Design a protein with these regions (language model features):
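N-terminal secretory signal peptides
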Residues: 1-14, 18-23
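Catalytic loop of the DD-peptidase/beta-lactamase superfamily, centered on the K-T-G motif
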Residues: 28-69, 151, 157-160, 195, ...
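Active-site helix/loop module of the DD-peptidase/beta-lactamase fold
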Residues: 37, 53, 83, 88-92, ...
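Catalytic-site signature segments of enzymes, centered on catalytic residues
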Residues: 69, 84, 131-134, 150-245, ...
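A short, polar/charged loop-to-alpha-helix boundary motif
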Residues: 74-81, 374-380
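Active/ligand-binding-proximal structured segments within catalytic/core domains
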Residues: 97
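A generic structural signal for nonpolar/aromatic side chains embedded in well-ordered alpha-helices
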Residues: 139-140, 174-175, 182-184, 289, ...
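Solvent-exposed loop/turn segments at secondary-structure junctions
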Residues: 146-147, 204, 369-372
Length: 395
């Protein structure tokens, strides 16, 4: 992923969406008028910022209760968004990566406070604090002291296709002294590992590489076998190649006031943000996250492990839009209430997940448009409605 999910394009969207259509599948709450009310609410919110396509889902007690698609997956062909449309979910990928790492903890392959360096095939240490090891917990919580300063300067993406550079080679180019992009000043902060929050894509790339080495096979294959298959996530893919064209949500950005498609891109740090998934699939995944690790009759994490992921901390440097950082999951205010959450953003996509652990419920929202301040507000409005005291489709 090249852009942080916190980045916002200030250009206001002027694209007028005509004939926004809602398509529905899966389980729904309540009577038809209630469903129509939710449809009308979401369509109104979309029109505020001219979002071409959106998918939303609600999970409760380990079940995806409500999933629905709105608008267009592809504007030119007027192909509608369905609940099986596969969106690039960007940094929501990190929640899946974190979940797989926690499975390795449960399997006793690693411990959270183990140093990661012994599991690597290259040396890893912050040169300013060489005696302080970087641990799995540090990476999961964005307190590893690994900096993204150089990461954002060098574009490793490949347009229209999956990246060919292996993730290990990519990481060494940034983290191994003497390699292409590695300088001690740019690739590591002056802070000691474990002390200061700084969002790190490189840290999550490292987690994907570590999980592959420790788990005995590519982490992507581990997630297919241990997470996606048990949860029946049939429309989720780590690659562009494995995302059927008929199911792809075309990403869009505004250029000179006109909606323009953005080419799909592949990048070598796949564990950071390469996942494509449908709202039906991902709502099933977050159903498990909100329900103590269990959904669809399958357990992907023990309840104590899932609860541990949602324990929030406030390290130095935590930005004011967050109220806490957990293991993969973050926390922020939604309508004045602190909720576990994560956002994802890349050119042409903006995604979000919010959770209410007390009610074992969660909301998912995917869009195929670059983020703006206005679309951020829309996503929050929809998530708030989904997690509110009334269920989707009511009021």
């Amino acid at each position: 992923m090249r852009t942080s999910e916190w980045d916002v394009n200030p250009q206001r969207r002027k694209f007028l969406i005509a004939g926004l259509a809602a398509t529905a599948a899966g389980a729904c709450f309540g009577r038809a008028p209630q469903i129509e009310s939710m449809d009308s609410f979401i369509l109104r919110e979309m029109k505020k910022t001219n979002i071409p396509g959106l998918a939303a889902g609600f999970a409760e007690n380990g079940v995806a209760r409500w999933v629905r698609g709105y608008g267009f997956a592809d504007v030119q062909t007027r192909r509608p968004v369905s609940t099986d449309t596969m969106f690039h979910i960007a940094s929501l990928t990190k929640i899946v990566t974190a979940t797989m790492v926690m499975r390795l903890v449960e399997q006793q392959r690693i411990r959270l406070d183990d140093p990661v360096a012994p599991h690597l095939d290259f040396a890893l240490a912050n040169p300013s604090h060489a005696d302080v090891p970087i641990t799995f917990r540090h990476l999961l919580m964005h307190v590893s002291s690994i900096s993204d300063e150089e990461y954002y300067k060098h574009d490793s993406r490949q347009s229209g296709t999956d990246a060919t550079q292996p993730i290990g080679d990519f990481l060494k180019s940034f983290l191994l002294p003497g390699q292409q992009y590695c300088t001690s000043r740019a690739c590591f902060s002056s802070e000691s590992p474990g002390t200061t929050w700084s969002y790190s894509n490189l840290g999550y790339a490292l987690l994907g590489y570590l999980a592959s080495r420790i788990g005995g096979e590519d982490m992507r294959e581990q997630t297919r076998k241990q997470i996606f298959a048990p949860l029946r996530m049939r429309h989720t893919s780590w690659t562009i190649r494995d995302t059927p064209e008929a199911l792809r949500a075309t990403p869009y950005d505004m250029v000179d006031g006109k909606l323009q498609p953005v080419p799909s891109v592949g990048f070598p740090d796949w564990s950071v943000g390469m996942l494509r998934s449908s709202v039906a699939d991902f709502t099933q995944f977050v159903a498990a996250c909100a329900n103590g690790g269990s959904a669809a009759g399958h357990r992907i994490l023990d309840e104590t492990t899932q609860r541990q992921m949602l324990e929030m901390h406030t390290p130095k440097g935590l930005p004011d839009w967050l109220t806490g950082q957990g293991l993969g999951w973050m926390a922020a205010k939604l309508d004045g209430i602190t909720r576990p959450e994560h956002w994802g953003g890349d050119p042409g996509v903006f995604t979000a997940v919010y959770m209410n652990p007390e009610k074992r419920s969660a909301a998912v929202v995917f869009t195929n448009a670059s983020v703006t301040p206005e679309s951020k507000a829309v996503i929050k409005n929809i998530a708030s409605r989904l997690l509110g005291s009334t269920k989707p489709g009511s009021g």
